[in-house]
Amino acid sequence: MKRKLIAAMETCGFKEGQTLLLHGTLNPEAAYPDTFATFWTDDVPDGVHFDNVTGSYDWAFSVIIYSNDPKIVNTKKDEVRAALKAAGFIPQGKGQDAPSDEQTHTGWAMDFVITEYLI
């Protein structure tokens, strides 16, 4: 499911390892890219069960967009939400402001769930 999330984010212009990063992996010594996104797997609980066998997993992801241009944050979030929704991810609301470690950047965080069916 991470690969699916990454592929959907790449349709929005993010590049894995450059402007799309696992949350917490940005080099603290490096300058922030002008615009970038991070993601994190929040949880992957069992979904359904049948005869003591797990039939699905519900993947929960957080995606955070950061930019030094607030206009980009305010428009890119809609593009990302639409791309992830088209890829099968279910938005959990519209999101919320996200703090940044750099005063030059603002952020927007969104949560998504997608079910992985095993049977």
In which residue ranges do the predicted regions lie?
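Short, low-complexity, polar/charged sequence segments that are solvent-exposed and flexible
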Residues: 40-43, 56-60, 82-86, 112-113
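Short secondary-structure boundary micro-motifs
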Residues: 47-48, 57-59, 81, 95-97
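Short, solvent-exposed beta-strand/turn "edge" segments of beta-rich domains on protein surfaces
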Residues: 50-55, 101-103
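Acidic-leaning, charged glycine-interspersed low-complexity segments
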Residues: 77-119
